[in-house]
Structures are given as structure tokens and as C-alpha cells.
Amino acid sequence: MPNLFGNVPLFIPRRIVSGGQTGVDRAALDAAMLLDIEHGGWCPAGRLAEDGPIPNRYALQETRSHEYPVRTEQNIADSSATLILHEGALKGGTLLTKRLCDKRKKPYFKVEIKDQMIDAVQTWLVTQTPEVLNIAGPRESSAPGIHSRCKKFLLRTFSVE
């Protein structure tokens, strides 16, 4: 499938899901929409996020719970694999994502958001070929600017330069 850069990527999942939180979650959904990849996932009841209700442009389903861990586990359960993008040590919901992947024995790849890691992510994607890819990581308030960095990283990841 051609993308914004006019290149053919090594592997693109059919669908990208996330929980809709600020930061990495929304960067994943924004990149998916820019690349014309189906997107979705689960979010807390009331479309809860740290900046208020998650905008309706994101095609997310609400869980019955307002608790973030419920949507985190549901997105892991409904996906083929999880890509955990981070900067520094895993903590909070990002660490929970890793632990829930371990608990459910679901494949995941945790990687720092650095351009030199794009090839490693592409290689993992080609190996796993996840039809539905869950993408998770820190919220914007715990890593200011991560939305922008993550979106650029994902746009580069799904292209061959």
C-alpha cells in the first residue's frame, strides 16, 4: 500500500488500535488516519482522557468502566500484537501494558522512539505480521512532546526511505 512518502512499506497492519489517551495513543491513531489504515480500539466510558473527552474523530468503542486498565487489557486482547513506544523507563500505564501482554502471552515489542530503531520495528512487524496492531506508550503529560515525536516515528516506520 503506498503511503504519504510514495514508498511501499515492508509491512502494514490492517488495523491499528489504541486507547485514545494523549501522547502515544493519539499519535498512533493520527498516523493511521494519515496513512489510510483502519483504526479503532477501546477507551474508558465517557471517552475519558487526561485532556477531557476523546474527540469523536477517533473511532473508539467505550468500555463499561471509567478505569484505564480495562481498556488497556481489552485492546491487548483484541489485537494480534502490541508495539510499546517509550522514552526511558516504562512506568504507569505503559508498564501495565507490558505486564498484561506477558500475562496474556501476547507478542509485544518495546522500543525507544529513536530513528535508529525504525529498522528494528519494521523487522519485528515483518516477523509478526500482526493483522491488528495495538500501539501504546506514555501520555503527553508524562512525556511532553511525545505525540509529535511518536507520530513522526510511526510515519517513518510505515515507509521505506
Model-flagged regions — what are they?
Residues 161:
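Short, flexible loop segments at boundaries between secondary-structure elements
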